[in-house]
Amino acid sequence: ISGVISDNATGTNNTSVRKGGSGTWVLDGVNTYTGETRIDQGTLKIKANAATSTIIADASEIRFELIEDNQTGPDNTFNDFANSRGGGNFEFVGNADETNVETLGALNSRDGANTVRLTAGGGTGTASLVFDTLSTIQDDSTLNFDLSGGNGGNITFTNYTTQNSNIDDAKVYV
């Protein structure tokens, strides 16, 4: 998806992005939406557009969560996903020979086996993600951080404290 995903024209509502079902979406436009980015299943890749990347707004939450069939979501809309566990991948892909950083809001893992992955663009390039906080990891969820393709890049949480986080019987893998 190379075009811009933006909030509505009046600015009264935040637009959110929801990746559902198997398969892969790639975002590489300069998006201005300020709602959450939700991955129910499959892979959502964001491809750096500059050294300081702006694919997703800095305050946008990244959330792994699947609402099961026959349930209503937080937006009161009936979902259409098969009755299964969630689980998805969020991948940041850097540019060749550039030090790429994407800054985001909170990271939440609420359902399924999930992975946050870094992939450098090649050459001397690196890929790094900066999240505001690791907000929630529920006990029926696992969260894997795969830095192996980041060419020395990092995943950083700038405001993480255990006092303001909902970390149940978490399973976190690096």
For each of these PLM feature ranges, what is it?
Residues 1-58, 112-174:
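Extracellular repeat-rich scaffold modules on cell surfaces
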Residues 27, 38-113:
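Extracellular beta-solenoid/beta-roll
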